[in-house]
Amino acid sequence: TRIERLERQAQQWHLVDSQQTLHGPYDQVIVAVPPAQAAPLLAGVANLVAPASNSSMEPGWAVAITLPQKLDSSADAVFVRSGPLDWIAREASKPGRANSENWVLQSTPAWAEAHLDDDPAQIVDALVAAMGEVLGIHIPTPVFQQAHRWLYARPAADCEWGALAAPEQGIYVCGDWCLGGRLGAA
């Protein structure tokens, strides 16, 4: 169910969905969505709508692959930040992960923007080829592959809104766009 707006009535919040169904009442609401989706929800809360309206996000493609054998590369993670690739990581090098040859590939925002509507299989092919170039080795055909497009992958600029809240109204906002583009900032 997609919530389209928040309404404050008698010191409580009601959520209105795309079918105009009313949900609630709620004493408090936490808005944990990208700024483009948060701004319309926060329209009635002046000190919260401005940060959401003035923040933008960049897209990204993430690809997960499993290879049939271990790559002959000492690299476990590489910040590439050029061409199609921003980051590649060997998952088995992380504590507590499976020993299979799983990799995560993340695109640069500019490349993702240029390829937003491409077929996911084409995205996998392009990023795997770029990975081979970065590592300087042949990458065998993956036995598993999956691509996911993130329209709102990370903040377009560094931001330091910090905690966004109107506690007197019982509304709180969180997300990486409030403090920075990495998981810990969310």
Can you annotate each of these PLM segments?
Residues I30-A32, I65, L105, Q145, ...:
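Generic structural signal for small/hydrophobic residues in well-ordered secondary structure
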Residues E4, P35-A38, K70, S93-K94, ...:
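Short, solvent-exposed loop/turn segments at secondary-structure junctions
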Residues G60-A64, L85, N102:
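Short hydrophobic/aromatic beta-strand or adjacent loop that forms the aromatic wall/cage
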Residues L71, R97-N102, S107-L151:
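Flavin-binding catalytic cores
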Residues A92-S100, F144-V173, W177-L179:
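FAD-binding beta-loop-beta segment adjacent to the flavin cofactor pocket
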Residues L22-D76, I137-P140:
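Central helical "cap/lid" subdomain
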Residues R2-H14:
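A conserved short coil-to-beta-strand element within the FAD-binding core of flavoproteins
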Residues A185-A186:
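An active-site-proximal "capping" alpha-helix that borders the catalytic cofactor pocket
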